[in-house]
Amino acid sequence: MKTSLLVFLGLLAVFLLSLAFLAQAPSPQEIPNPKIVTQGEDVEPHPPKSSFYGKRGVYLTAYAAANSAKLNEILAQSARFGLNAIVIDVKNNEGEVCYLSQVPKARTIGAVRPVLDLAGLVIELHRRGFYVIARQVVFYDPILAKHLGVPTSPWVLPTEAEAVSYNLAIAQEVEGLGVDEIQFDYIRFPDDGPIGPDYSARCQAVESFLSQAKASLSVPISVDVYGRVMWPWNAQKIDPIGQHLEGIARIVDVVSPMLYPSHFVEPELKADPYGTVLRTMRHGKARVEVPLRPYLQAFSMAIPTGMSFPEYILAQIKAAEESGADGYLFWNPRADYSSLWEALNLAQKERGP
């Protein structure tokens, strides 16, 4: 009788856990294609990691990567033009953990949105020759901020121990699913203060997280930083976001400055995609020796009059290459890279056979 009761209680616990997971999972209508690849018997689940140098690729949301038609089109075009990397969200700007995470806190706070079969997707991308970069949004996290009840919501600050341990646990789990690199984004404080005061304490908090990540992971780590972080004044630690180029560069393997000309305040920088990328990269390379792999603007915003969108993208590519960038990545939040393919086609024609 006692044994039967224990069995019944065990089955009841499993049933309740299943209900809890189903309650936090999105409906099928919310997921374009929740499982697009399966693990083949003849494919190694964790192939040898390739070098992080010389990577050129595009960014995809988890939802875009889970759409098999969209993904296959992007992979085909990427291969055609010699791109060799794919960046995919594993934790996005909504605070969603985009695969079937087993991290207890992710499940407890309802952050798990299993859009991707991440392990299977990594295997398929490796099979097709792509280096896989997992993008993890760190301190902009509406779900965690709401759970913690912090006044900085939707941000959690880098000084919040629970936010640090949560994100480290996710990164460690993602590493175990076979990705080649983890890229931390929103690895900063909110941009909510004047430039000028001493923000050394904020810089130290950001670098403390990165040091812990570096110590706990075996894959390369990269960091997305504001484009302005590359400019000389940043060396004084006077930026409220807490990103100090020299400090970050001492820890990580790659820095990815987001060099979108449209996001600069100065009109002359907005109007000159080539000059803006070239000058900003040269400033950064004069300060640090870490590989700089910039994000280039592949979304249509503030395109100068008289310049086509593909020409705008191509100008950035030329500047990145001339400045000595160690590869580059393209950002379009909708994964619409039609103008990028036009730009790369123009580049091929200019170079000739």
Where are these regions (language model features)?
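Boundary/entry segment of secreted carbohydrate-active catalytic domains
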Residues: 25-74, 78, 297-299
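Short, acidic/polar
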Residues: 65-79, 160-175, 233-249, 306-321
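Catalytic domains of carbohydrate-active enzymes, especially glycoside hydrolases
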Residues: 71-96, 176-181, 248-256, 320-328
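Active-site-adjacent "subsite" loops/lids of carbohydrate-active enzymes
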Residues: 47-63, 120-123, 134-177, 314-316
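Aromatic-lined carbohydrate-binding surfaces of glycoside hydrolases
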Residues: 83, 87-118, 130-163, 179-203, ...
